[in-house]
Amino acid sequence: MDNIKRVILKLSGEALAKKEGGYNDELIENIANQVKTIVDKGTDVGVVIGGGNYWRGRSNDNIDRTKADQIGMLATIMNCIYVSEIFRSQGLKTNILTPFECGSMTKLFSKDRANILRKALLYSLQEEQDIHISQQIQVLY
């Protein structure tokens, strides 16, 4: 992995959950440790997280498609906040980028912020050990 500059890791919401509900802390801590090992070698890591442990699309025809998508986005943000805190407990710096304002817990996604990740090809983010946890941006109908 010494020559790999950047990795994107996709974590489904369902993968984060225990069968009986709640988060699988042992698994998430293990993922955080593995990510830290990669970051410590100088590789930039972006994490995309799903919300499927809370919400799997529109389950009721009485719910508008747009509202169902918004519920999914909120579920994803909850997962991002949780995973971010586990990553921080392992010594990683995190930022949560979302497509809409969500208080001080997240940063609004913008093209400029996305370019920060692209610039990492030229300027290493290694010093900050920055892990960007991005909500999967869904198409709104």
What are these regions (language model features)?
Residues 1-44:
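N-terminal glycine-/serine-/threonine-rich phosphate-binding loop
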Residues 8-12, 49-50, 97, 124-127:
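Short beta-strand segments
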Residues 17-19, 54-58, 80-81, 130-141:
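Short glycine/serine/threonine-rich phosphate/pyrophosphate-binding segments
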Residues 24-29, 109-112, 136-141:
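Charged helix-capping and loop-helix junction motifs
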Residues 39-40, 88, 118, 136:
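Anion (oxyanion) recognition and catalysis
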Residues 42-46, 120-122:
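Loop/turn-to-beta-strand initiation segments
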Residues 52-55, 102:
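Short active-site-proximal "capping" loops at secondary-structure junctions
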Residues 62-123, 129-130:
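Ligand-binding beta-strand-loop-alpha-helix segment within the catalytic cores
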